[in-house]
Amino acid sequence: MKIIAKKDLFINDEIRVREVRLVGLEGEQLGIKPLSEAQAIADAANVDLVLIQPQAVPPVAKIMDYGKFKFEFQKKQKEQRKKQSVVTVKEVRLSPVIDKGDFETKLRNGRKFLEKGNKVKVSIRFKGRMITHKEIGAKVLAEFAEATQDIAIIEQRAKMDGRQMFMQLAPISDKK
C-alpha cells in the first residue's frame, strides 16, 4: 500500500545510500551522518529512519515513528475527502409552450435541486417550426431565472446549441 502518491518512502534497511542529512524527532537538524550512525540513533530512540528526500544531495532522512506518520497521513487524507463536496448538475427540461402548472412543477423541482447545493441546467428543446420563435424560449428561461434569483445566480446565460436553448444556474452559497 502506497501512502504518498508519486514516490515511495524508504525506511530503515531499505535505504541504500552512504550518508544522509539527518533530521531529529522534533525536526532539529542533526547534520550529515553516515547511514550506519543514523540508523543507530534511530534504533536507540526506538523509532524508524525514513528517507524523505532521496533526490537531495545528500539525501534527507528523518527519525520518526513511521506507523504513526502513516496513520496521521491517512487520517488527513480522509478529512480532506470529507470536506470535498461533489457538485452535480441536474437538468430541468422545459418546452417553449409550457403551461403555467407544468412550469410551476418544474420550477419547484429546480428550486429543490438548488437548495441541495446542485447546479441546474435549464433546457428548452424546440420541435418542428418552433425553432423560428427562439424569443419565446428565451422568455421562458428568463422567467425561470427570475423565479429563482433569490437562491441562484446565472452561471451561464441562455444560448442555443442546435435545436436546444439552455442556461445554467448555480446556488448562491456556492459562489461565496
Curated annotation (Swiss-Prot):
Q: Name one GO cellular component term.
A: cytosol
Subunit relationships: Monomer.
Q: Which family does it belong to?
A: Belongs to the IF-3 family.
Function according to Swiss-Prot or TrEMBL: IF-3 binds to the 30S ribosomal subunit and shifts the equilibrium between 70S ribosomes and their 50S and 30S subunits in favor of the free subunits, thus enhancing the availability of 30S subunits on which protein synthesis initiation begins.
The terms under GO molecular function for this entry are: ribosome binding; translation initiation factor activity
Family annotation (Pfam families): IF3_C (PF00707), IF3_N (PF05198)
Q: Which cysteines are joined by disulfide bonds?
A: none
Which terms does the UniProt entry file under GO BP? ribosome disassembly
Sorted alphabetically, the keyword list is: Cytoplasm, Initiation factor, Protein biosynthesis
Please state what the protein is called. Translation initiation factor IF-3
Specify whether rRNA processing is a keyword of the entry: no
- As recorded in Swiss-Prot or TrEMBL, the protein's gene is named infC
Protein's cellular compartments = Cytoplasm
